[in-house]
Swiss-Prot record:
Role summary: After binding acetylcholine, the AChR responds by an extensive change in conformation that affects all subunits and leads to opening of an ion-conducting channel across the plasma membrane.
Membrane-spanning intervals of the chain: 245-269, 277-295, 311-332, 463-481
Originating organism: Drosophila melanogaster (Fruit fly)
Membrane-side (Cytoplasmic) residue stretches: 333-462
InterPro entries assigned to the protein according to its UniProt record, in alphabetical order: Neur_chan_lig-bd (IPR006202), Neur_chan_lig-bd_sf (IPR036734), Neur_channel (IPR006201), Neuro-gated_channel_TM_sf (IPR036719), Neuro_actylchol_rec (IPR038050), Neurotrans-gated_channel_TM (IPR006029), Neurotransmitter_ion_chnl_CS (IPR018000), Nicotinic_acetylcholine_rcpt (IPR002394)
GO biological process: chemical synaptic transmission; monoatomic ion transmembrane transport; regulation of membrane potential; response to insecticide; synaptic transmission, cholinergic
Transcription keyword on record: no
Glycosylation sites: N50
Keywords, ordered alphabetically: Cell membrane, Disulfide bond, Glycoprotein, Ion channel, Ion transport, Ligand-gated ion channel, Membrane, Postsynaptic cell membrane, Receptor, Signal, Synapse, Transmembrane, Transmembrane helix, Transport
Signal peptide (residue range): 1-18
Disulfide bonds: C154-C168
The protein, known as: Acetylcholine receptor subunit beta-like 2
């Protein structure tokens, strides 16, 4: 029995030792430094020796990503690192007293930090996104670079959309302290100058697929507000951006230009097809769809009409005019002698002058030859009677010789015209034949007039074809070429300064790391 008791003792003793808490001691010098610095530290008091002393805060921005530039809501969304630096005399120490510790990382909630906010904020979130740790140096210098996603209000200029350039401002300053208490300066500011040409750090910037950044200057300002005795200092960052136009050119401009030049084909379509007005209305409906699409993109402002809106309006006016002119051309095309008479001026202008100007050649329309010397009043001349009788049978011809000779003599005395001494059946047949011939002759003359009206409509179609073609070409160039960004040859600064390459689905390592891997 005692064997089992001894075995249990040997098993329980190691188990008890294994469950005992194990303590690890941190860096004692760092812990002691942290306790000494922050034990009696008040983070609510501005860190100056004298209350009248001005605390200088150096401010800078590092742009990580241009998330969105919303024209409709007029807001710019950016991902930034807000770099801040200042001196806190209460956070100084001697490294020799703390084991050579020269740098310490502390939560930013435990020390005094300047209340730097974005003045022109859009969504109400004025502060930084994440309260990261601050870096303390033994000299009392404090570094703090919290990340933030800001939505800043930006007045967009849509006059030259989609070939536009936008200028947005980001105004940072202390919300509580005036310029006599906290003086803001840019990290790269030169003494005696308030302007920094490259005011935003773009070394960690991910290139945007929609915008090119041209300029990023920063300016220090001092401004008086109502009921304040001292000015408040702020730093205003200016972002000048130029839109990359490939997407809008392919998806908006090219289809719109194609619809514009479809208007020209209306006048090339023959009038007899009956589809001219249908084509015009179809183009007009397509332009209306483009207008609805544009209304979803641009902001509802009455200050300026965007470039694309001007072009769509110009195209819609052309299509409306094409509908009007097409109706007029069709009206002329289907005119007839019974409803309209062609005036000599119209005949001379559209049948002789303008065809030469429009380089048109008309096929000559010739009427059949008719004998206009035959009266149409039921009488005939001597030659007609002789020809008629010569065609009759010989019996009838012989029986009529005497009467014919007497009638012939009388006809000479009465304007060479005699009554027809033919049978009623023959006379009726002759009248019917002459009526048919006269009807065909009148129909041919009417057809000639109808063809003249059709040719006038063809001349008008050719004239409007050239007129609308020139209008489309010069109108397109005149409207689109208004944009100043088409003539801006400045190289994007983000491509020059960014150290993050943009490649197609490839991540490129820095050259020094590549060399280390290869060696």
């Amino acid at each position: 029995m005692w064997h089992w008791s001894l075995l249990c003792v040997f098993l329980l003793v190691p188990l008890a030792n294994s469950t005992a808490p194990i303590s690890f001691e941190a860096n004692p010098d760092t812990k002691r430094l942290y306790d000494d610095l922050l034990s009696n530290y008040n983070r609510l008091i501005r860190p100056v020796v004298n209350n009248t002393e001005t605390l200088t805060v150096w401010l800078g921005l590092k742009l990580s990503q241009l998330i969105e530039v919303n024209l409709k809501n007029q807001v710019m969304t950016t991902n930034l690192w807000v770099k801040q630096r200042w001196f806190d005399y209460k956070l100084r120490w001697d490294p020799e007293e703390y084991g050579g510790v020269e740098q310490l990382y502390v939560p930013s909630e435990h020390i005094w930090v300047p209340d730097i906010v974005l003045y022109n904020n859009w969504d109400g979130n004025y502060e930084v996104t994440l309260m990261t740790k601050a870096t303390l140096k033994y000299t009392g210098e404090v570094f703090w670079e919290p990340p933030a996603i800001y939505k800043s209000s930006c007045e967009m200029n849509v006059e030259y959309f989609p070939y536009d350039e936008q200028i947005c401002f980001m105004k940072f300053g202390s919300w509580t302290y005036n310029g006599a208490q906290v003086d803001l300066k840019h990290l790269d500011q030169i003494p005696g100058s308030n302007l920094v040409q490259v005011g935003i750090d773009l070394t960690e910037f991910y290139l945007s697929v929609e915008w090119d950044i041209l300029e990023v200057p920063a300016t220090k300002n001092e401004e008086y507000y109502p009921d304040t005795l001292e000015p408040f200092s702020d730093i205003t960052f200016k972002l000048t951006m130029r839109r990359k136009t490939l997407f809008y050119t392919v998806n908006l401009i090219v289809p719109c230009v194609a619809l514009t030049f479809l208007t020209v084909l209306v006048f090339y379509l023959p009038s007899d097809s009956g589809e001219k007005v249908t084509l015009c209305i179809s183009i007009l409906v397509s332009l209306t769809v483009f207008f609805l699409l544009l209304a979803e993109i641009i902001p509802p402002t009455s200050l300026a009409v965007p470039l694309l809106g001007k072009y769509l309006l110009f195209t819609m006016i052309l299509v409306s005019l094409s509908v009007w002119t097409t109706v007029c051309v069709l009206n002329i095309h289907f005119r007839s002698p019974s409803t309209h008479n062609m005036s000599p001026l119209v005949r001379k202008l559209f049948l002789h002058f303008m065809p030469k100007l429009m380089m048109m050649r008309r096929t000559q329309y010739t009427l059949p030859d008719y004998d206009d010397s035959t009266p149409s009043n039921g009488y005939t001349n001597e030659i007609d009677v002789r020809d008629s009788i010569s065609d009759f049978p010989s019996e009838f011809k012989d029986s009529q010789d005497g009467a014919y000779d007497n009638g012939m003599q009388n006809s000479v005395d009465s304007d060479n015209v005699i009554p027809r001494n033919l049978t009623p059946e023959v006379l009726q047949a002759l009248r019917a034949v002459r009526f048919i011939a006269q009807h065909i002759k009148d129909a041919d003359k009417d057809n000639e007039i109808v063809e003249d009206w059709k040719f006038v409509s063809m001349v008008l179609d050719r004239f409007f074809l050239w007129l609308f073609t020139l209008s489309c070409v010069f109108g397109t160039l005149a409207i689109i070429c208004q944009s100043p960004s088409l003539y801006d040859t400045r190289s994007p600064i983000d491509r020059q300064l960014s150290e993050i390459p943009l490649r197609k689905n490839n991540f490129m390592l820095p050259p020094d790391i590549v060399r280390q891997v290869l060696t």
